[in-house]
Amino acid sequence: MTGAADRGEIDRAHPPGTSRYATRYVTVHGYRRAYIRAGRGPALLLIHGIGDSSQTWADLIPLLARGRTVIAPDLLGHGRSDKPRGDYSIGGYACGMRDLLTVLGIDRVTVVGHSLGGGVAMQFAYQFPERCERVVLVGTGGVRSDIHPLLRLAALPGSGPVLSLLTTASVRHIGWTVTRALRWLRTDLGRDVDDLMRTLEDLHVDTARAAFLRTLRASVDGHGQAITMLDRCYLAAGMPSLIIWGGHDAVIPPEHARILQAAMPGSRLEIFADAGHFPHRSDPERFRAVLEDFLSSTRPATYSARQWRDLMRSKGRHPDQRPAGSRSRSRRMSPAAGGETALAAASSTPGDTRGGEGPGVRGEP
């Protein structure tokens, strides 16, 4: 099957610092979706975070496209995709990823999600386990309620006019001055100022700002993150999973990485000690090496409707427990259909732990 987008509109212009690959467009359910497609081989789906776009992967796409098909979409309401009044829930985004892949003729993928995109990745694996081979979570949401206070405030009713003011040209100029100071003071938030300000720059457009608020309020309220994966981690078994986190993440605390790893027997954890919320931007070469090692040393998960049913019936009381050294073949999940996220994974690679032992942690020396 040839994707309709491959025969459709292609925008070959790209500003400095963005991906050198053309942005392609395809219409799904009446809305234009922007995406980047590069390379040939097993498919890798890269999902960005809230307020961001496929350009967050710009440095990685050329590296990952050597021997793989890389698909990096702009989520609905983000980047160059349409920004309608619509469903901006985690589940809605997961369905959007399924539909985009269907149009492009791609059946199965390894999915990599950053921040909000991690929640979408988990939801995709939960809703469509037959289409997911592996899951990679990068500074993902959906673990505990903790999140940066500014995001909690932005989720409150009445925050729209304030956000509109913050995205005016004069205030953005002040923001750049403040962020330079944050960087100079070596604060955790200062490590990500360029990426955070890039996100803020995009919100000066009314439709982008409205989509940002709808997306945020679908998963965050005044108390923090309103959805969690931890009560459904048992639903994933046999899905190779990798967790990557920045050691100085000021948006979602690094402690969430270890909480998530403990809930996912067999998963790998990589801590980028000097990175903030965007480890894939801070050190793209190391990120590529970690991801390539994970991909080459794990087998794609296989789907079994019977195993899936047994996991659901077990309610987590009887997880798949094979002797150490054996290879788990059951199917794994991610977020819950009601918008909650869930994830647990057991991979069969050296360095991972099996049989209920604590997973291995890898970080910078």
Regions found by a protein language model. Give the residues of each.
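Alpha/beta-hydrolase fold catalytic core
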Residues: 1-43, 66-68, 106-107, 193-194, ...
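Catalytic histidine-centered segment of alpha/beta-hydrolase-like enzymes
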Residues: 272-288
